[in-house]
Curated annotation (Swiss-Prot):
PANTHER family: ARGININOSUCCINATE LYASE. This is Argininosuccinate lyase. Keywords: Amino-acid biosynthesis, Arginine biosynthesis, Cytoplasm, Lyase. It comes from Lactococcus lactis subsp. lactis (strain IL1403). Pathway: Amino-acid biosynthesis; L-arginine biosynthesis; L-arginine from L-ornithine and carbamoyl phosphate: step 3/3. Signal peptide: none annotated. Disulfide bonds: none annotated. Its EC number is 4.3.2.1. Its main location: cytoplasm. The gene is argH.
Length: 459
């Protein structure tokens, strides 16, 4: 059995089951490059402050770089008996340079070491998420440009409400994802902080230079309080919260893609590249990727809830419970980056059935609001107009016709304010084109939304 680095005050060793229960190396392996980066900064600082000699600092750094090379070449075997990523890396360093490796941990604890690794890891993930979000937003804008004059039903309660521009519908998701982008950008602020040097919780008696390691690691600033530094997991919770909101938005979009691609809607068709078949039904084309994004949303929610539950009762400063902060973060990072990539692919290859979309608006009463507005512009109080149109819709339903099928004589019996121009008003395309209020679905309004988005994206 490997001798534990903390084993001096113990008379008995951990039994195998307990050792396995406490070990975290099975899921911490992805932190290895960040752990080595943190150690390289730490040992340089130790040398420059004279805590260890310049020669010792140089030899340890050379050893760390050899371990780093082995890691890149896939020559590192992570061992459970070394507990965690830090002890595994230090074990390999010891193989390279011998007992001198023990000086690396001067003025450092695994408490500040592990959270430094996590700040570095999450900072890199946030860069990837922001880039993937930018690409997806660009794809949505490009799709919207070609769908400004595509007419479709707008829905409330999943019932036809008013005709809208499909471009407008797409730009609503652009706005959601832009808010997601802004939240992740703000997440960077709280992630771009250096906890290294906080040691176990109280700082250290050694004359360390935390500003130097902050600079070497590329952090914006150092934590102001050593206890906060080792116990803070807000930056991860922010990430998981932002990830949950993002997945909720993607899930809503996927739900609509699933509806629109169904036989009953036939509004869009997903590429074969993002669909699968059935093992028994030869005709099936299943939108599995959209369903998977919708399904994976739950696991991201779960990761947020799990860490919130871990954190809610922890006294300052470090607790072993913190070992449970990583797997959910890793899983959510993988999930959202993959989901963004798949979503981008689905939208980039989406086929839009413009004819079916517009035809659907001609077989409903989504133009009823246009008729009520028409009467209101003629001087009739809107509430009265609403009542009259409602009665007319009921009569049309009984007769099996739509508002555009009502003859002018019947219209004028409803209200003498109605003239022949009402038929133009009732057209879906006219209805959409007239709604050019700020943020509205009118063609000119949607064009303005797209132009603003292009400026934001610099495309």
């Amino acid at each position: 059995m490997v001798e534990k680095l903390w084993g001096g005050r113990f008379e008995a060793s951990l039994d195998k089951q307990t050792e396995e229960f406490g070990a975290s190396i099975k899921f911490e392996q992805r932190l290895a490059p960040f752990d080595l980066k943190g150690s390289l900064a730490h040992v340089k600082m130790l040398g420059e402050t004279g805590i260890i000699t310049t020669e010792e600092s140089k030899k340890i750094a050379e050893g760390l770089k050899k371990v780093e090379e082995k890691l890149l070449n896939g020559q590192i075997e992570f061992k459970m008996e070394n507990e965690d990523i830090h002890m595994n890396m230090e074990s390999y360093l010891h193989q390279e340079i011998g007992p001198l490796a023990g000086k690396l941990h001067t003025a450092r604890s695994r408490n500040d070491q592990v959270v430094t690794d996590m700040h570095l890891y999450l900072k890199s993930i946030l860069e990837a998420v922001l880039e993937a979000l930018k690409v997806l937003r660009e794809t949505i804008v490009k799709l919207a440009v070609n769908q400004i004059d595509t007419i479709m039903p707008g829905y409330t309660h999943l019932q036809h409400a008013q005709p809208i521009s499909f471009g407008q519908h797409l730009m609503a998701y652009y706005q959601m994802l832009t808010r997601d982008f802004e939240r992740f950008e703000f997440n960077v602020k709280h992630t771009d902080m250096n906890p290294l040097g906080a040691a176990a919780l109280a700082g250290t008696t050694f004359p360390i230079d935390r500003m130097l390691t902050t600079k070497l690691l590329g952090f914006e600033k150092a934590y102001d309080n050593s206890m906060d530094a080792v116990s803070d997991r807000d930056f991860i919770l922010e990430f998981l919260s932002n990830a949950s909101l993002l997945m909720m938005h993607l899930s809503r979009f996927c739900e609509e893609l699933l509806l629109w691609s169904s036989h009953e809607f036939k509004f869009v068709s997903l590429s074969d590249t993002y669909s699968t078949g059935s093992s028994i039904m030869p005709q099936k084309k299943n939108p599995d990727m959209a369903e998977l994004i919708r399904g994976k949303t739950g696991r991201v929610y779960g990761n947020l809830t799990a860490l919130l539950t871990v954190m809610k009762g922890l006294p300052l400063a470090y607790n072993k419970d913190f070992q449970e902060d990583k797997e959910g973060m890793f899983d959510s990072a993988d999930t959202i980056i993959t989901s963004l990539t798949v979503m981008n692919g689905m939208l980039s290859t989406l086929t839009v059935n413009r004819v079916n979309m517009e035809k659907s608006t001609e077989q409903d009463f989504s133009n009823a609001t246009e008729l009520a507005d028409y009467l209101a512009t003629k001087g009739l109080p809107f509430r009265k107009a609403h009542e009259l149109v409602g009665l007319l819709v009921l009569d049309c339903i009984k007769k099996g016709i739509y508002l555009q099928d009502v003859n002018l004589q019947d219209y004028q019996m409803l209200s003498p304010l109605i003239n022949e121009d009402v038929y133009e008003v009732l057209k879906s395309r006219t209805a959409v084109s007239r709604r050019n209020s700020l943020g509205g679905t009118g063609f000119e309004s949607v064009k303005k939304q797209i132009e603003e988005a292009k400026k934001e994206l610099q495309i």
